[in-house]
């Protein structure tokens, strides 16, 4: 009753679900009361929200499907690219922004990994790099870091305390083990204290969502766009849940869908939300067992459904370096120009991007969540010449190239 009253107070007529003023039609009153008693509050809320969405879809004009000419808006686009290149706020790490052109609005990026190889840690790093205005640099100390954009982090596995210590480690450059064991060296404790202060003034919002439906994810993203001005969303990670299975069964009248279809629907909805609300979304998946032997690490390694990759703008896998990699890189490493990599990041899809079918050879410090690509090769170990693109953020939402 409280939920229905709240909708009614907002001017939404819910009398077709329950009409408290009805005293004459006893049969209708009994049917409505039985429905309320046997329906949980989430289903009631979703039903009302779906009805509102249908009204919006019917009466709000859409620009999709209109016939257009190749020269429509061409001069304006050319001038816009002169003033502001097609880049987004920078992500963390050398070479990453050369490949991705930053976290671009209306784009969906997917970064997957086997369990335990850094999917969450790299996402935490990007959340902090987007949302914090200072970060500790091993060479220069505390340095300014952009404009601290509003960012939402939805975690499906880790609790808040687990996320917090990873964030402290990344921002301060202090190994998480030192934080967890309360055994600091030198000025590390002071750096962690400052990291906590930086997070306190940031615009980072964290939501724990261990069991979720498609509607839950959509509502949380829309709510934080509306209430917190969020433009960057990190969702860890794309998977099936009991609630999604129940939701799909309810929508399809009990028809069961395969896991790959459900995962495709979730990734498709994330991409639609990115387009509809003009936000950037970063997500991830687990990998299947084939990652150990694959020489072409592409979408076929995605656990559950390779069709997830159909909806994304950028696809990457984080993979461990094996002996075969070190043998293939022997000549490069012998020159002592680079440290020995312990991680390789495979870029298998890059819509409107130059680099794909490549590895970013990376030195990963799991303790501080800092993954630093050093150089790039093809999947066949051929060295690629690649510059480290610097994206400059001077004003909120305004980016340029250095």
Task: Give the ranges of each region predicted by the language model.
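Short, small/acidic-rich helices and loops at N termini and domain boundaries
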Residues: 1-74
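The Walker A/P-loop phosphate-binding site
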Residues: 60-174, 401
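Cytosolic-facing regulatory segments adjacent to core modules
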Residues: 98, 133-229, 299, 359
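Structural recognition of the conserved hydrophobic beta-strand(s) that form the central parallel beta-sheet
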Residues: 153, 234-235, 279-285
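Short acidic/His/Gly/Ser-rich catalytic and metal-binding motifs that mark active-site loops
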Residues: 160-164, 241-247, 290-293
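C-terminal regions of RecA-like/P-loop NTPase motor modules
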Residues: 173, 177, 181, 214-230, ...
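A structural motif corresponding to the C-terminal end of an alpha-helix
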Residues: 198-205, 269-281, 311-313
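Phosphate-binding/switch loop-helix module in NTP-utilizing enzymes
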Residues: 205-273
């Amino acid at each position: 009753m409280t939920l229905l009253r709240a909708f009614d107070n907002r001017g939404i007529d819910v009398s077709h679900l329950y009409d408290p003023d009805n005293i004459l039609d006893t049969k209708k009153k009994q049917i409505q009361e039985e429905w309320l008693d046997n329906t949980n509050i989430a289903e009631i809320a979703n039903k009302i929200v779906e009805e509102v969405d249908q009204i919006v879809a019917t009466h709000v004009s859409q620009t999709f499907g209109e016939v257009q000419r190749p020269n429509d808006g061409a001069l304006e686009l050319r001038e816009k690219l002169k003033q502001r290149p097609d880049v987004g706020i920078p992500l963390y790490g050398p070479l990453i922004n050369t490949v991705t052109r930053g976290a671009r609005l209306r784009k969906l990026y997917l970064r997957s990994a086997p369990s335990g190889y850094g999917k969450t840690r790299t996402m935490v790093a990007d959340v902090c790099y987007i949302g914090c205005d200072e970060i500790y640099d091993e060479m220069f100390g505390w340095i300014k870091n952009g404009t601290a954009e509003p960012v939402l982090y939805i975690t499906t596995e880790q609790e808040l305390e687990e996320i917090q210590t990873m964030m402290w480690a990344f921002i301060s450059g202090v190994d998480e083990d030192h934080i967890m064991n309360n055994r600091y060296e030198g000025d590390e404790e002071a750096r962690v204290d400052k990291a906590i202060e930086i997070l306190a003034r940031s615009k980072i919002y964290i939501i724990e969502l261990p069991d979720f439906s498609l509607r839950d994810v959509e509502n949380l993203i829309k709510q934080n766009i509306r209430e917190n001005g969020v433009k960057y969303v990190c969702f860890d990670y794309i998977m099936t849940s009991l609630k999604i299975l129940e939701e799909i069964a309810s929508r399809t009248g009990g028809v069961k869908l395969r896991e790959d279809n459900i995962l495709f629907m979730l990734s498709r909805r994330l991409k639609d939300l990115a387009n509809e609300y003009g936000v950037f979304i970063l997500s991830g998946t687990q990998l299947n067992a084939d990652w150990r032997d694959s020489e072409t690490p592409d979408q076929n390694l995605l656990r559950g459904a390779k069709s997830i990759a159909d909806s994304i703008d950028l696809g990457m896998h984080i993979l461990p370096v094996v002996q075969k990699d070190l043998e293939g890189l022997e000549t490069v490493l012998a020159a002592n120009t680079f440290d020995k990599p312990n991680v390789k990041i495979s870029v298998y899809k890059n819509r409107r991007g130059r680099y794909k079918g490549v590895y970013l050879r990376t030195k990963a410090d799991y303790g501080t969540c800092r993954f630093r690509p050093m150089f790039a090769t093809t999947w066949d170990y051929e060295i690629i010449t690649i510059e480290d693109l610097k994206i400059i953020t001077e004003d909120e939402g305004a980016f340029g190239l250095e």
